[in-house]
From Swiss-Prot:
Belongs to the GatB/GatE family. GatB subfamily. This is Aspartyl/glutamyl-tRNA(Asn/Gln) amidotransferase subunit B. It holds the Pfam family GatB_N. SMART domains: GatB_Yqey. It comes from Streptomyces avermitilis (strain ATCC 31267 / DSM 46492 / JCM 5070 / NBRC 14893 / NCIMB 12804 / NRRL 8165 / MA-4680). It catalyses: L-glutamyl-tRNA(Gln) + L-glutamine + ATP + H2O = L-glutaminyl-tRNA(Gln) + L-glutamate + ADP + phosphate + H(+); L-aspartyl-tRNA(Asn) + L-glutamine + ATP + H2O = L-asparaginyl-tRNA(Asn) + L-glutamate + ADP + phosphate + 2 H(+).
Length: 505
């Protein structure tokens, strides 16, 4: 009996017979200065294996101590997810052997998590709100990092050897596990993407992690199964591990729906396994047979005391929670006058905070959105960077917008100014000065350029006089060319129509 197939059914055919059921497990690296159970630094970019100690390497006799900031961050996340916070919880040893786990067990939580029974409301692109229920959020430590050398895929299969860096081993993690997500139907992949995006915004708003997926600070495991319409029992699930972008979460879920349906339609059986997602093809491949909880032989961690957060502390943390991201977006959407689809695009681009900061620096909302979602988003895509990593500040973007409003720059010149700032040529004002980019505001010079354009294009001028006002665009273009794009196009058009005795209406 087949358990896999290289063939896929269409997405529509898959949904014609089956309902998708998802479970999402999101791992977030907490932004503490030291590791979860020792004093080693968590700073990125250090020499391999330079941020380790006997505790995070699992040496005999080394005793762990719980990072209080890690516990506080976990409680904040639980509260923001509307979870119940445990009055008493403890750590457990998750036992398995793998080179990136030097202790041969991971310190995690099993049946007593720090937070449980919550939910997160997520908004889809058409504005519909879907509630994702949270099973639990628990604390654990990250593993080391394996780099497989010599293989074609960068994975262990076919590699000649592997390099191990234990700097990451012991970094605080919180794992957020959803309850089975049912009822999303054809929108299941979209719901998965929206959930991870919403969770990322929430984590950032709390200030407990930068949640940079491209840097591995936030990773998602996509569990998916199918069940025939009308049946209550869940199907066998697969788990696509460590998906590291919003788009990939959606693509992985969609691919697995099609793959599962193809196997089931051919009379095959889905095996419970982990799978790897491939960005280049949008497909998944088999990893290993998925273990059950009992395979890890969990037992209470004897070297750590239980965690018992006081109710007063929990309520103090609750009182300090920021505005929920969805509520904030709805408020900003009203203030900015944008629809739900556009707001979702802004969210997916990671542009909300830069736009807000640009408005606070003096730009109007429309200009701030235009530059961050236009020229700067294009630059980020071309360079493979996040918007926040571009070498330009919200204050500098606001200054460009102010120069446009003041009539000192037009959009074309403003784009050149932004290009100069991104290239390291200085502040917007310095780039304007160096490149000589100010709009031609001398009426005499503009009038002369307009006269020259009319004289050089008599046929176009006659059309305009005859009532074809749209033809003025050709003369505006001629003037802009003559002034090297440094004229105010709107003022040029006004002068052309005045010269030809034609009104705009």
């Amino acid at each position: 009996m087949t358990t896999t197939t290289d063939e896929l059914v269409s997405y529509e055919d898959a949904l014609a017979s089956y309902d998708p059921v998802m479970g999402l497990e999101v791992h977030v690296e907490l932004g503490t200065k030291t590791k979860m159970f020792c004093g080693c630094s968590t700073e990125l970019g250090a020499e391999p294996n330079s941020q380790t100690c006997p505790t995070c390497l699992g040496m005999p006799g080394a005793l762990p101590v719980v990072n209080a900031i890690g516990v506080e961050s976990a409680i904040k996340i639980g509260l923001a997810l509307h979870c119940e916070i445990a009055e008493w919880c403890r750590f457990a040893r998750k036992n398995y052997f793998y080179p990136d786990m030097p202790k041969n067990f991971q310190t995690s939580q099993y049946d007593e998590p720090i937070a449980f029974n919550g939910y997160l409301d997520v908004q889809l692109e058409d504005g519909e709100v879907f509630r994702v229920e949270i099973e639990r959020a628990h604390m654990e430590e990250d593993t080391g990092k394996s780099t497989h050398v010599g293989g074609a895929t960068g994975r262990i299969h076919g590699a000649s050897h592997s390099l191990l860096d234990y700097n990451r081993a012991g970094i605080p993690l919180i794992e957020i596990v959803t309850k089975p997500i049912e009822g999303a139907g054809e929108r299941a992949p979209e719901v998965a993407k929206a959930y991870v995006a919403e969770l990322r915004e929430l984590i950032r708003a709390l200030g407990v992690s930068e949640a940079r997926m491209e840097m591995g600070q936030m990773r998602c495991d996509v569990n998916l199964s199918l069940r025939p319409h009308g049946r209550e029992k869940f199907g066998t699930r697969s788990e696509t591990k460590n998906v590291n972008s919003l788009r990939s979460v959606e693509r992985a879920a969609r691919f697995e729906i099609q793959r599962h349906a193809a196997v089931l339609n051919s009379g095959g059986t889905i095996i419970q396994e982990t799978r790897h997602f491939h960005e280049d093809t949008g497909s998944t491949t088999s990893g290993r047979v998925k273990e059950e909880a009992e395979d890890y032989r969990y037992f209470p961690e004897p070297d750590l005391v239980p965690v018992a957060p006081s109710r007063a502390w929990v309520e103090e943390l609750r009182a300090g929670l920021p505005e929920q991201p969805l509520a904030r977006r709805n408020r900003l959407r009203e203030e900015w006058g944008v629809n739900a689809h556009d707001m979702q695009s802004i969210l997916n681009a990671g542009a909300i905070d830069p736009i807000v900061a640009t408005i606070e620096a003096g730009a109007d909302a429309a200009s701030a959105r235009k530059w961050w979602m236009g020229e700067l988003a294009r630059s980020a895509n071309e360079s493979g960077k996040a918007l926040e990593d571009l070498p330009i500040t919200p204050a500098q973007v606001a200054r460009v917008a102010q120069l446009v409003v003041a009539g000192e720059l037009n959009d074309k010149l403003a784009r050149q100014v932004i290009e100069g700032v991104l290239a390291g040529e200085g502040t917007p004002d310095e780039v304007v000065e160096k490149r000589g980019l100010k709009v031609v505001s001398d009426e005499g010079a503009l009038t002369a350029a307009v006269d020259e354009a009319i004289a050089g294009n008599p046929g176009v001028a006659d059309k305009i006089r005859g009532g074809k006002v749209a033809a003025a665009g050709a003369l505006v273009g001629a003037v802009m060319k003559a002034t090297r794009g440094q004229a105010d196009a709107a003022r040029v058009k006004e002068l052309i129509l005045e010269k030809l005795g034609v009104s705009e209406g």
